[in-house]
Amino acid sequence: MDGYEATRIVLSRIQSLDPENASKIMGLLLLQDHGEKEMIRLAFGPETLVHSVIVKAKKELGLMNCSRSPWSHQDELISPKNNRGSSLNPASLPFYANGGRSSRDLTNDFELMDDMNSRSTDFLGSVHARSGSCVLDGLGYGGDSDLGFGGVPCSYFARGFCKNGASCRFVHSDGGADLVGSPSRIELLRSNSVPPRLAHHFMTRSSLPSFSTKGVNLQQNDVQRAAAALMIGDELQKLGRWRPERIDLSAMACPASRQIYLTFPADSRFREEDVSNYFSTFGPVQDVRIPYQQKRMFGFVTFVYPETVKSILAKGNPHFVCDSRVLVKPYKEKGKVPDKYRTNQTTERELSPTGLDSSPRDVLGGRGFYNNTQDVLWRSKFEEEILELQSRRLMNLQLLDVKKHFQLNSPTNIHSPNPFSQSLISPRPLSVIKREYDGGEKGKGSSKEGSDDDTMNLPERLEDSLPDSPFASPAHHLLLFADSADNNGSDLWSPSSDNDDNSTPSTLSDSFNSFNYQMPRLPAIGMLPGRGGPTCRVGI
């Protein structure tokens, strides 16, 4: 256990026995400079030992009789001539060496210690003669601190992460350890006679350099004496200009409520120290950060208390720092979308239903509606059937377009069918005409005619668009077209020629052999079902 922890325990034990005079008694003990071991012994000693220390300290402070005013006694304590017990030898301590000594002997022992240590004399004299900032500079708590004494705490590290890491010029340390382990610094803030910068430095400077053990002990003793001298007199609060309250730990846990956002012109030339000096008139400043920018136009100021931020915002804008116009805004952290909200959005998106006309790959949206794989297979099979029906319908429309091209007696070759042909908009009446050719000048065979409007008419004058080469016959083209359609699962028609007079040259009729072609039966899509389909014997 270190001296700070022991001091905290002793202070708590004294407060439990005498809460009104605990700060004064603790200040006297710190001025007497008992040492770490004796403070630890007092922290873990019996209750009677602590009670005897309280009684003796109250007698020394003059709190037992009311004849002496507290102001005169404080002058005796702080005065270099009458300061008592600045350097006590632990071996000669009446509290610890012999608990059975009389109070008269103890008083004589205290009266013998009138000589004050030179370091304490100089330091306590400087408390009255110099300002608080000069005192801190003498102790190594200066702002620039060339020797490396202490440092301003990093506000980013206090929030949880600092991007600069070990190369950061601010101190990465947990300030809570100092607040808990150093009651003298907490009590120091209660004194209204302390300037804001003095209180701020006592709160934030966490450690002293360890050049040598003797130097560390000297500096710790000076800090303890300064704290004790400032917290002995609670009446000094009436003379102070700044009256801080107790530390609000809830406000310390939420740094956003203790920060403000500054905006200023790019041509401003003030430094962070100037900003700290200006805003310290409103309350204690913990940190000032002006990030590096090409044209610096904003910064952040962190205060010790959130009430300081409220008072600054209530004053309004503008503020002037070194003749530069500064605007103050409340600091707001960037909003973060909670993971729970994002998860709910993803779940709702996955559970959104899809229609039957969706793609087969769009099963991700409706995955939550299927309990097993059979439902998924049934859905995919059903969609495949719909796609097959649509492909058959498209094939029928293409054949209708081929029919329209033949009816227009086009002298050129057959063009690629257009599914968006005008024949779909205004269809003509359909009829089935079957005629038998016997070639050349042979007689005409019998033919069947049907006038059903729901049946498909075969293409007319197919011979007019025949190519010159016999190897590119339309019959061969239609057979290949029918085979490719059969592979896709579709049923096709086979066109036959229309036997008009003077439509087919007689010279071409002898070059081909006649053959019979069985047309496949059409499904019930736009046509009436036939028994076997018409048989067309083409003889050209």
UniProtKB/Swiss-Prot annotation:
Superkingdom of origin organism: Eukaryota
Residue numbers bearing the Phosphoserine modification: S451
This protein's name: Zinc finger CCCH domain-containing protein 46
Region called Disordered, residue ranges: 337-365, 436-469, 490-514
Record function comment: Possesses RNA-binding and ribonuclease activities in vitro.
EC number annotated for this UniProt entry: 3.1.-.-
Entry keywords, A to Z: DNA-binding, Hydrolase, Metal-binding, Nuclease, Phosphoprotein, RNA-binding, Zinc, Zinc-finger
RRM domain boundaries: 258-334
SMART domains (UniProt xref): RRM, ZnF_C3H1
Zn finger (C3H1-type) start-end: 148-175
Gene Ontology molecular function, alphabetical: DNA binding; mRNA binding; nuclease activity; zinc ion binding
Biased composition (Basic and acidic residues): 337-351, 436-450
Positions with biased composition (Low complexity): 490-511
